[in-house]
Amino acid sequence: MTERAGLRLHDTAAGAVRDFVPLREGHVSIYLCGATVQGLPHIGHVRSGVAFDILRRWLMARGFDVAFIRNVTDIDDKILNKAAAAERPWWEWAATYERAFTAAYDALDVLPPSAEPRATGHVTQMVELIERLIERGHAYAGGGDVYFDVLSYPDYGQLSGHKVDDVHQGEGVATGKRDQRDFTLWKGAKPGEPSWPTPWGRGRPGWHLECSAMARTYLGAQFDIHCGGMDLIFPHHENEIAQSRAAGDGFARYWLHNGWVTMGGEKMSKSLGNVLAIPTMLQRVRPAELRYYLGSAHYRSILEFSDIALQDAVNAYVGVEEFLHRVRSRVGAVVVGDWTPRFAAALDDDLSVPIALAEIHHIRAEGNRALDAGDHDAALQSASSIRALMGILGCDPLDERWESRDETSAALAAVDVLVQAELENRQKAREERNWALADEIRNRLKNAGIEVTDTADGPQWLLGGDGK
């Protein structure tokens, strides 16, 4: 099958499913809003990575060349505040958690992006974008900051459906703003914060500006698809559109948004304290099982986390895995086959993964019946098809990469038991004000390549790679 098979995607801007037609035949350009690296990645973060990794894999299977950009926001109020509270340099804090996100994506076999730009590496492009906006009458300097004039852009609110009169940027009152509906492009320097020189004085970029500048740098003035979580529709993506198009760029042609992961009906977020960190989850289930779970619901739906739902996904994945192992042990090697028309139709219909999974489990049932009846050819054909389908979803159980990840996950679980014991000893030493012993334990862990960060939720550890 070819790229002209009729892929349709739900475009948030249109509020409907649309035929996908790329700007350039055979090529697709995608920008995914990546992490603000302020803390450990949780399953809400990584669901976005998995959802749009499936999109990328399907496009590649269809024969497209895919340019996939995922940024890193490494300068932000939350990063600065948390680093200051921990008495650590902001750049060290950001780098620590950037590595944690990379490790989480790698563990779940999310394909590496074509490029992964950091915000701090693209300040020059951000300043150039601001200059264009000021020249066109869409931005102004005030009080040391630079703001986007929302009323200067008549189409503001079309993505989110917000009426201009009802806009609240959530930035608080700023003395330099002409209108409180305007949003910040550039923040004037504050004592103790990182800053860069500009024509308007030293400062640092606003969050919305970062993505517009990086998307343009790597994908050009117009590109195919912009992805992100549904919580980014407003104000982040609305503001990206406004500043990019006001500067004369076509920007994204399709907008795709994935649903939240919730617990008890509430969005999973650090501020609510209801997060499930990826390292914690990988002590409970294997990486492939977690990926299967996060990708199993339709990407636009809310994924309500529960232990029962997680176990159901694990059981479903194990059922597929056991079938493939049965075929391999009885018949022989199982090569990757072709995808089926029903599977292709499901993914072409706005990435309907639940229907695609139903096809996989239907084939598995047929394959098990064939194997029990001694029809090895039919069983092998079923197994080969399943490998192809599960591979497009990124969780083929017979892929050798998963076997190595399973071993790594088991090793990390064993290390965690040992590290937690050391952290308990360190906490006891701190309670007894035995600072020398507490420092000795921390240094011992550091020499083993384990970074310990004290947070409001207790100490967290990461493999830092700096062991002697």
From Swiss-Prot:
Subcellular compartments: Cytoplasm
Motif ('KMSKS' region): 267-271
GO CC, alphabetical: cytosol
E.C. numbers: 6.1.1.16
Keyword entries, A-Z: Aminoacyl-tRNA synthetase, ATP-binding, Cytoplasm, Ligase, Metal-binding, Nucleotide-binding, Protein biosynthesis, Zinc
Main location: cytoplasm
Motif 'HIGH' region, residue numbers: 35-45
One GO MF term attached to the UniProt entry: zinc ion binding
Positions of Zn(2+) binding: 33, 211, 236, 240
Pfam families tied to this protein: DALR_2, tRNA-synt_1e
UniProt keyword Aminoacyl-tRNA synthetase, yes or no: yes
Record-listed ATP binding positions: 270
Family annotation (HAMAP family): Cys_tRNA_synth (MF_00041)
NCBIfam families for the chain: cysS
Protein family (similarity comment): Belongs to the class-I aminoacyl-tRNA synthetase family.
Protein name: Cysteine--tRNA ligase
UniProt gene name: cysS
